[in-house]
Amino acid sequence: MAGLVNRSQHAPPRRRFKAVLEICGVLAIILSLGALVLAQSSSKSLPYQALVLTAAIPLPGVHGRFDHFAFDSAEPGRLFLAALGNDSLEIINLTGGARVHTITELGHPQGVVFASGLNKIFVASRDHQKLYIYDGAAYRLITAIDYHGDVDNLRYDAAAKRVYVDYGDGEKAAIGMVDATTNQRLADEYKTGSHAESFQLAETGPEMYVNLPQQSQIAVINRVTQAISRWPVTWKENFPMALDEADRRVFVGFRIPPRFAVFDMSSGKMVGALPCAADTDDLYYDSELKRIYVAGGQGFISVFQMKDPDHYELIANVPSGLGGRTAGYPRQPGKKGGPPHLFVAIPDRTGHGAEILSYVPVPSE
């Protein structure tokens, strides 16, 4: 860490844990209001503006918090947003910058992925405990798979055409798989021992990296042999995660305390950490600019610059909005070959409706 530059009793365990997290999140936001003003003021003295706000897409009639994004990179480009508090999936045309469709009655949707070659949308429903599969053209329901447990984060392996499904609690918690072509649930699954939050699939190997906040661990699962190793972590509520496979690094966001942490992918050793935006739920690694974007419900995006794989620097705290912890950063270039965009979903608040903010990264000079 020296190398980094500063800057209800009878409810199911998963529900109790979620309730505690939501209470903690609210308290964190309240306690962070003063810190937000300070962070925004101090960011003005940083070298340059790391992100430029280019658009705000309104979402009238959408209420409550958001969970996750997915993207369709084909022209004109679509954004899929799980509006958890609104029980809906909001679909945005990125060229027109407007909502084009809403799928309703999803029962607190959480994870969402889009299978581009198959034109299918997969949506995880927490309350219905199901994985819904929709046709991506007509938005028609194809089928639903019942997991009999909290269905949360999803990941899509485009090469294998498989959707990875994080579901369940305690001993029943696992990451299962669905054949995206046949829409069939596969028998194989990976037991995690507790409900997982963000997990990432390595592209250069069989590993899957999994945040397990209830156990204060990061699990590394070999998808071929099913062997599992576990890294203990010092802080609490490790939720978002991103990978830098070229430099063998795992980036993790913690909520208690608010920290951006870097782990060696081979050893599991934490090589450093820095304070970041509170109440984070998404973070992304920009391999071209060597940056990490950490979105926090505190109301800003912490931007970190990699100096080398062991050294990072906070270069900006970019204002967004209270509750803006849901973000998306598609790897593909923006529309018509333009720059990529960082999208942040902001819930509705007094005097202002829900919206999606779009930022363009600004390279350092």
Model feature map: region roles:
Residues M1-A19:
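N-terminal secretory signal peptides that target proteins for export/translocation
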Residues I23-A35:
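Bacterial N-terminal signal peptides
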Residues N6, I30, A39-S43:
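Intrinsically disordered, low-complexity segments
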Residues A35-E365:
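Predominantly soluble domains enriched in secretory-pathway, periplasmic, or organellar proteins
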Residues R7-A11, L33, P58:
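Helix-centric, low-specificity signal for extended rod-like, repetitive segments
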Residues P12-R15, L21, G25, S43, ...:
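Intrinsically disordered, low-complexity segments enriched in glycine/proline and serine/threonine
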Residues A11-P13, A28, H63:
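Compositionally biased, intrinsically disordered low-complexity regions
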